[in-house]
Swiss-Prot record:
The keyword Nucleus does not apply. One of its GO terms (cellular component) is cytosolic large ribosomal subunit. Pfam families: Ribosomal_L31e (PF01198). The keyword Ribosomal protein applies. This is Large ribosomal subunit protein eL31. HAMAP family: Ribosomal_eL31. InterPro entries: Ribosomal_eL31, Ribosomal_eL31_CS, Ribosomal_eL31_dom_sf.
Length: 87
């Protein structure tokens, strides 16, 4: 079994999504979350949990949240898994 190498909680700002056409905003938010985690966790292999996707799409494609709190875990093989962080 692969062990967790690094675990971190991030608050990811999604304010730049407002610059995207309204019908593409949720897709852009998912890409921003993935890109943010790739940059900060230094890995190209990022897997997002279903709960993140459901939160971003909860109000439809035109109104994603302004920020999202995520717990990211990097494993020894370089894969990053992200899930919603409990408060």
């Amino acid at each position: 079994m692969v062990e967790v190498q690094k675990e971190q909680v991030y608050v990811i700002p999604l304010r730049d999504v407002k610059r995207v056409p309204c019908y593409k905003r949720a897709n852009a938010a998912i890409k921003d979350i993935r890109g943010y985690l790739e940059h900060h966790m230094k890995s190209d292999d990022v897997k997002l949990d279903k709960s993140i996707n459901e939160l971003v799409w909860a109000r439809g494609s035109q109104k994603p949240p302004r920020r999202i709190r995520v717990r990211a875990m990097k494993f020894e093989d370089g894969q990053v898994q992200a899930e919603l962080a409990e408060e």
